[in-house]
Amino acid sequence: MTVSTTPKSQRNVARGVWELARLHTREAWLCWYPAIWGACVAAGMRDVSLELAPFLRLLFGIWASVTATHCAFCTFNDICDQKLDKHVERCKIRPLPSGMISTSEAVVAFICWLPVTLAITWGTLGPAVMAGFIPVWVLSTIYPFMKRIMPFPQVVLGAIIGGAVFPGWVGITGDLKDLDQALPLFFATASWVVYFDVFYATQDRPDDEKIGVKSLAVLLGKNVQILLAVLGALQVLLFAVTALRADMSLIFWVLGLGVWMVNVPWHILSLDLKDRHSGGRIFKSNIKLGLYLTGVSLLELFVVRVYDISLANMKMELH
């Protein structure tokens, strides 16, 4: 533990806790999307009849649980990375390296987030869905150390965020059976996460090379766009397999996957390795793209599952 020697005028513990948890950004959305996709695909593959009110409660539970998980482990990540962050231009202003909050205060914040995360998950989603979160929590614990020992830490991050597919799936099915049916969506999401995080990592490549931080952006250097093209094609293929197996309608195929396919080459061609901010802009574009696909998935689910069922119920009442 360390005691901060930063002048009080520069310290702001409340803001430090807020920023450690990334509550000032939209990054938590990236973890929410796969859980919603998992729920939508499960409803299609299991041919589940949905009612609007229970489904909205499920969405709220997923949002609350994923957000709390993200807050906890982003705090943990920054505790582990604080010495490295001092040497990375983009990260110097984070709460710990800037002295906004001390290490001991950050550790207390992390410890407080853990029971909050468990309570929210259990209370809003129940024990079955909570079991689906366990792999996500385990991988989130080891992720900060992967960038020190392996040249592709993005793969672990892909498994973490992609793993959110399973709690969403279980939230619809109510059990842990047939999780293998969700694997195409898991791998599609994981490949997308690796894809956008490689863009993100290009921002820090010069600093990472100096301090020995490992990433695919560092490993591949100027050849990184070849990997991005492979990952782009792979995610589109796996999303298509998922949609086919879930018998999704033209709403998803045209408005969802069609738009996604247009964005992938645009991202890759837009990357300028000489501009440090280029990768960050494309990363933010992927946050918006994920939100768009989530909206299309919910629209498709509502039109095909909820609306059709409501219409059928109205017809039965009229008869």
Curated annotation (Swiss-Prot):
Pfam families, alphabetized: UbiA
Transmembrane regions listed in the UniProt entry: 28-45, 48-68, 106-126, 127-147, 152-172, 182-202, 224-244, 249-269, 289-309
EC number: 2.5.1.-
CDD domains: PT_UbiA_COQ2
Cofactor requirements of the protein: Mg(2+)
Keywords (A to Z) from UniProt: Magnesium, Membrane, Transferase, Transmembrane, Transmembrane helix
CC terms in the record's Gene Ontology section: plasma membrane
Gene Ontology terms: biological process: terpenoid biosynthetic process
Main location: membrane
Membrane-topology descriptor: Multi-pass membrane protein
An MF annotation (GO) of this entry: transferase activity, transferring alkyl or aryl (other than methyl) groups
First-level EC class: transferase
Domain of life: Eukaryota
Pathway membership: Secondary metabolite biosynthesis; terpenoid biosynthesis
Annotated Gene3D superfamilies: UbiA prenyltransferase
Cellular compartments annotated: Membrane
Function per UniProt: Polyprenyl transferase; part of the gene cluster that mediates the biosynthesis of macrophorins, isoprenoid epoxycyclohexenones containing cyclized drimane moieties. The first step of the pathway is the synthesis of 6-methylsalicylic acid (6-MSA) by the polyketide synthase macA. 6-MSA is then converted to m-cresol by the decarboxylase macB. The cytochrome P450 monooxygenase macC then catalyzes the oxidation of m-cresol to toluquinol.
Additional note from the record: The macrophorins cluster contains a single gene insertion (encoding for the terpene cyclase macJ) compared with the yanuthone cluster that produces the linear compound yanuthone.
Family: Belongs to the UbiA prenyltransferase family.
PANTHER family named among the record's database cross-references: 4-HYDROXYBENZOATE POLYPRENYLTRANSFERASE, MITOCHONDRIAL, PRENYLTRANSFERASES
Name of the protein in its database record: Polyprenyl transferase macG
UniProt source species: Penicillium terrestre
Gene: macG
